[in-house]
From Swiss-Prot:
DNA-binding region(s), residue ranges: 29-48
GO CC, one annotated term: cytoplasm
Gene responsible for this protein: slmA
Coiled coil regions, renumbered to chain: 118-138
Location within or outside the cell: Cytoplasm, Nucleoid
Recorded superkingdom: Bacteria
Function: Required for nucleoid occlusion (NO) phenomenon, which prevents Z-ring formation and cell division over the nucleoid. Acts as a DNA-associated cell division inhibitor that binds simultaneously chromosomal DNA and FtsZ, and disrupts the assembly of FtsZ polymers. SlmA-DNA-binding sequences (SBS) are dispersed on non-Ter regions of the chromosome, preventing FtsZ polymerization at these regions.
UniProt name for this protein: Nucleoid occlusion factor SlmA
PANTHER family: HTH-TYPE TRANSCRIPTIONAL REGULATOR RUTR, NUCLEOID OCCLUSION FACTOR SLMA
GO terms for biological process, alphabetical: cell division; negative regulation of division septum assembly
Species the sequence originates in: Marinobacter nauticus (strain ATCC 700491 / DSM 11845 / VT8) (Marinobacter aquaeolei)
Amino acid sequence: MTNQKPSRRESILQALVELLQSDPGARITTAGLAKTVGVTEAALYRHFPSKRKMFEALIEFAEEAVFSRCQVILQEQEDVRVRLQQLSHLVLVFAERNPGLCCVLTGDALMGEDESLRKRASQFFERLETQIRQALKEGEIRQGLRPRTTAARGADFVMVFVEGRIQRFVRSSFLRLPTSDFDEAWGLVSEAVWG
């Protein structure tokens, strides 16, 4: 079995994520990124026409990685409580394994960038919330598991938990892991959603 060398495009994205992880909150310049990758800025632009396209590629990677697995969970699990627990855990594990990407998804790395890019990043969480809301509605119909309040408010509560854990991870410079004490914390979330 041979290990394939990553493409230049993948190397650029990997270097960008590593820069975001090693210096959270710092503004990334194409000159600094080119230096890290070991290429010229012109070489960066051969693969990405703009820094925006680099960030969009990272967001697309996160969406593909998370939502393809979300679909598997939604298809395999019947119980809405298990579905939501696994969906939440999946996102938090992904965040923990990809700290630099968390800076993009939370918008921290996008400060000073085009506002439409921040909106693009927020679509990740909006899409997740939609899936959670839909799962809550299906749980009510198929299992008779009615949330204490509406499906929209239940989904909002789950999202506050997930996004809060990811935001805390970024704010702590990746020291406070989003999955720490997950089972205990999820028990409290579950209690709040269903009673």
